[in-house]
Amino acid sequence: MALDKNCIFCKIAKGEIKNNRIAESNNFFSVFDIKPKVNGHALIIPKKHFVTLLDIPNNLGNEMLEFTKKVADKLMDEGYGDGFNLVMNNLAVAGQIVMHAHLHILPRKEGDGLRAIV
């Protein structure tokens, strides 16, 4: 899909909004969440506009997984957590707020106060 001119993540992808990228690949980038649930809460975002996981082409799946692992490993190495959760909300009924597909990496530490989702 093309970029959506009104989408905040598309604006970040195009460099229209200043951000501190954690990492970047050919088709994905990672930034810290602006309203973190825990210290080190990061987002994995496709550079192209896709609304949900179901819209991301299968041929990008391996890159997305490898990139997610790279970012999670970096967060762990930097001391943000001793474990982590991966969360992806797909559509409003499931809690998606920004309608641009993105994956949350939530570094976890003992006693961080974040309740388990499942």
How does the language model describe each region?
Residues 1-118:
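HIT superfamily nucleotide-processing domains
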